[in-house]
Amino acid sequence: MAYPFQLGLQDATSPIMEELLHFHDHTLMIVFLISSLVLYIISLMLTTKLTHTSTMDAQEVETVWTILPAIILILIALPSLRILYMMDEINNPSLTVKTMGHQWYWSYEYTDYEDLNFDSYMIPTQELKPGELRLLEVDNRVVLPMEMTVRMLVSSEDVLHSWAVPSLGLKTDAIPGRLNQTTLMAMRPGLYYGQCSEICGSNHSFMPIVLEMVPLSYFETWSALMV
């Protein structure tokens, strides 16, 4: 969960998000080293009077500044491709949930059950209870089992939306006429908040997402009551 004045990313709750955090730190360190080198060279150019106006050819320097950026790009691309492959891989999901974006709410359907579906609307500010979060609470939470692979099928009934939950490393476009899929696995129980991340109209800011991750026994009890 995010907190006021937070500068970093949210705490990782899924293996994918942990990998994304490691990749973020890896890339940030490379950017920091490059920036430091560039600033050092600029400071030398501004403070020294030594110049080489007669230099017409520098094969060694040209070779270095051609090969070095290529190596840096490879060091960034390899872990990135690995994470992209992990995010795209879906093996034997334990549960499938179909979510549809609407202007301006989400609807969910548990496809493994015969009649388990509902709409999820934001709770208006004037109806919030003490301790609830403004613009993030919904009337129907998406209850899912923790430590199990869940496949999310994402689409839209009208315009472009985007189903995103930052702490799980999820962001999938909801496109009319197209069915996108992603997987999630939460390692800890709790409430995880997200929002529509694609500008979809006047009430775009009022399409929150709330996932309630619970142990399998609680999920089975909840699903039995809902059906």
Curated annotation (Swiss-Prot):
**Listed Pfam families:** COX2, COX2_TM
Cofactor: binding details: Binds a dinuclear copper A center per subunit.
The UniProt record gives the binding positions of Cu cation A1 as 161, 196, 200, 207
PROSITE patterns assigned to the protein according to its UniProt record, in alphabetical order: COX2 (PS00078), COX2_CUA (PS50857), COX2_TM (PS50999)
Q: Which domain of life is it from?
A: Eukaryota
Please provide the record's keywords in A-Z order. Copper, Electron transport, Magnesium, Membrane, Metal-binding, Mitochondrion, Mitochondrion inner membrane, Phosphoprotein, Respiratory chain, Translocase, Transmembrane, Transmembrane helix, Transport
| Binding positions for Mg(2+) per the UniProt entry | 198
Cofactors: Cu cation
Function comment: Component of the cytochrome c oxidase, the last enzyme in the mitochondrial electron transport chain which drives oxidative phosphorylation. The respiratory chain contains 3 multisubunit complexes succinate dehydrogenase (complex II, CII), ubiquinol-cytochrome c oxidoreductase (cytochrome b-c1 complex, complex III, CIII) and cytochrome c oxidase (complex IV, CIV), that cooperate to transfer electrons derived from NADH and succinate to molecular oxygen, creating an electrochemical gradient over the inner membrane that drives transmembrane transport and the ATP synthase.
Designated name of the protein: Cytochrome c oxidase subunit 2
Tell me the name of the encoding gene.
MT-CO2
